Every structure is written in C-alpha cells, then in structure tokens.
C-alpha cells in the first residue's frame, strides 16, 4: 500500500535512486496504490548525468510493495521494500534496464515492456 509521502526505491537505470509519491492516480480521492498502479512522484535522489534530475515530477508504476498482495489463487506475495519504475506519458519505461524481480500483476495491467526487461517475474 503506497500513499502520499511514501518514499520508494527506483528499480530502473533512469538515474533516479529515491522518489516520493505525491499523488495516486485513478479516481477521485483515491488514497492507496498497490502493485501495477500508476502514481505521480517527485525525484528526491538522483545520480549525476541522469535522464531525470532531482526535484523533477514524473510518473511511475509500482513493481514491488512490502505490503502483501493477495492473488486470485489465494496465495500472497510481498517484497522486502517498495519499488517503482519511472514511466513517460505513454506508459513506457524511461530506463532501459530493470533491477530485481517484479510482480506478475503487471502483466494484467499491460506493462509488457517492463515484464520483458525484468530479470525475474514472480
């Protein structure tokens, strides 16, 4: 569960390291986001010569959450931390590589480019 002010790690090579959620997209007064949801983030930490700079506002899709997510078969999946991948307006990833595993729920949300770049899909 991600809400406003939540800090997330960035799981791609766009150059951002840490981002903060500033808005959960999808519906009025929506409070929480989970795996596969698109959020608006502010970049809080970035490396030099990055595609994005500190202080920029971007969109991101959540790929890992520390809060468990229930699957249709009754099983649960959770990760060690909260991570996101930065995306552009066309929902394409800004980076060219994804680090760490991503959840299978992204496939149902049509984020096939992220699924194909990820080293492992759980």
UniProtKB/Swiss-Prot annotation:
Gene Ontology terms: biological process: translation
A GO CC annotation given for this chain: cytosolic large ribosomal subunit
RNA-binding is among the record's keywords: yes
Pfam families: Ribosomal_L14
InterPro entries reported in the protein's UniProt record: Ribosomal_uL14 (IPR000218), Ribosomal_uL14_bac-type (IPR005745), Ribosomal_uL14_CS (IPR019972), Ribosomal_uL14_sf (IPR036853)
Record keyword RNA-binding present: yes
Record keywords: Ribonucleoprotein, Ribosomal protein, RNA-binding, rRNA-binding
GO molecular function, one term: large ribosomal subunit rRNA binding
Function: Binds to 23S rRNA. Forms part of two intersubunit bridges in the 70S ribosome.
Protein family according to the UniProt entry: Belongs to the universal ribosomal protein uL14 family.
Subunit organization: Part of the 50S ribosomal subunit. Forms a cluster with proteins L3 and L19. In the 70S ribosome, L14 and L19 interact and together make contacts with the 16S rRNA in bridges B5 and B8.
Name of protein: Large ribosomal subunit protein uL14
Gene source species: Anaeromyxobacter dehalogenans (strain 2CP-C)
Gene this protein is translated from: rplN
């Amino acid at each position: 569960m991600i809400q406003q002010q939540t800090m997330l790690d960035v799981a791609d090579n766009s150059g951002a390291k840490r981002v903060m959620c500033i808005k959960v997209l999808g519906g009025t007064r929506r409070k929480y986001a989970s795996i596969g949801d698109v959020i608006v983030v502010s970049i809080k930490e970035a490396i030099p010569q990055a595609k994005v700079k500190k202080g920029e506002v971007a969109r991101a899709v959540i790929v890992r959450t520390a809060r468990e997510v229930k699957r249709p078969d009754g099983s649960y999946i959770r990760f060690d931390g909260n991570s996101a991948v930065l995306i552009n307006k066309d929902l394409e990833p800004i980076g060219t590589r994804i680090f760490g595993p991503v959840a299978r729920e992204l496939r149902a949300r049509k984020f096939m480019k992220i699924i194909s770049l990820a080293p492992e899909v759980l």
